[in-house]
Amino acid sequence: MDLCDFIIEHENDDLSSLVLHRDRWPGIDVALAAECISARRKLRYKVSEWYADPAIICPLSLSAEQCSSTATAAYKAAVATGRAYRSRKFFERASCVAVAERTVPPPSQKALRIADLTGGLGVDCWQFSKVASAVLYNEMNHPLFEAAQANLPRLGCGNVEFSKVCISPSTLPGLLDAFRPDLVFADPARRSGGRKVFLPEDCSPDILALQDMILDRGCRLLVKLSPMADISLMLRKFHNVKELHIVEADGECKELLLLMEPGFDGECTLVVGNAGRSVPPDSTGDIRFTLGEEKAAEPAFISREPEPGQILFEPGAALSKSGAFNLISARFGLEKLGKDAHLYCGSQLSADSAISGALAPFGKFYEILETAPFGNQAIRDFATRWPGADVTARALPINSKALQEKLKSGSKKKQNSDSQIHIFGVGTFIGRLLIAASR
C-alpha cells in the first residue's frame, strides 16, 4: 500500500488514534498521512477539484485552511485580467465557460505573465494559469514547494515556472527582471506567533517596502489583505491603488484585494464582489463606487412605519465592510431606516429593480409582514405570532441575544440562519420599531 492508498482508506478515521497506532503500518509515514488527511478534509468543499484527486499532495493542514477557495482564486484571476468576476453557476446557466473552468487563455490575455511571490499551496497559481500565458510560482516553504511542483502539472498547469526565493529588497529585482511579469501577486503571511495582525508591515514579505520596486518596473501589483484591515488606512499606506476589491464568499467577507497600477493617480474605485454566488444576467456582477461618491450620496430616510408588503434589505458582509451606507439608498432607491441601523426598505417595485441589478448577490431581501412600535406589548404580540424566528437588534440599547430572550424565540425553535421569519428590533429615524419579515 502506498501513501495515497493509505490516505484514501483512512480518510474518515480518527487522526489521533491513527498516529497513536502508527506501528501497525511500518512502511507508511503515518504522521504525514494524518496531516494530508486533515488537509484534504479542509479542501473537500473549499477546493473540491483538488479533493477529487487523491494523488494531490497537501502536506500542511494549516496551508489548506488558509489557502484560497476555488471561487476566491478564480476571482483573483478575473481581477488580473480586468474582467468582472462571474460565478460558475452563472456561466453554467448561460452555457458559457467560467473563469474557474477555462483551460485555454482567451486571445486578449495570451501575453499576460503573472508572478505569484507567495505561492503557498498553489490554488491561486492554478487559477492564474488558466488566464495567463506564463505564471511564476514562488514559495520558500520546502514541503509546499515540493507539493506544488507535483500538483500543478498534474492539474494541467503546463505554463507554471517554479522558484524558491526568500523575497526581500535584495532578491526581488533579480526575480522580476528574469521573469518579466505584467502583474505581481502577493498574499503576505502573518509573522506574529498566532496573534491577529491587520497591518501589511507586520507581514512577510513586507509589500509596503517592496511596492515601489515593483511598480517602477511597470508591473501591476495585486495584494491580498486581511478582511479586517482598515480600508482608509490601506489606501493611505499603499501607492497608485486603482481598485480595492472587498470579496465576499459563503456569507463572509473573505479578503481585501488591492490592485495597484504604475502611474495611476486618480481616486481608487472600491469594488464589492461576491465570489460564491451567481448574479442576474443583466448585472455587472459587482458594485463599484469611490469614497467621494459615498460621501456625496444623498440618502432617503423613512418618514413613517414600513408597511406590510414592502421590502427590507439587509446588506451582506462585504457590502457592509465597504461602508457604502448612503450610496445603497441613493443608487438603488431604498430608504434608510436609521443612521446606524444599516437596514433599508422600499416598495416592491424599487426592490425588484435592485434584485435584478447589482444588489442581489450582496445581501438579503425580506418581505415585511408586520411593524409595531418597540415596547413590551409589541414584544409579547410578536413572541406569540412569530415563535422561533431569527432575531436581530440594530441601533438599540440591547443586543440581539437580549432581544431574543425577551421574545423567547429560542424556547420553541433553535435560532438559525435558515429560518424563513426574521424579527428586527431597530432604532430608526422615527423611533424604535419591531419588524417581522419573511425571506
Feature locations, PLM:
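SAM-dependent transferase fold signal centered on methyltransferase-like domains
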Residues: 1-439
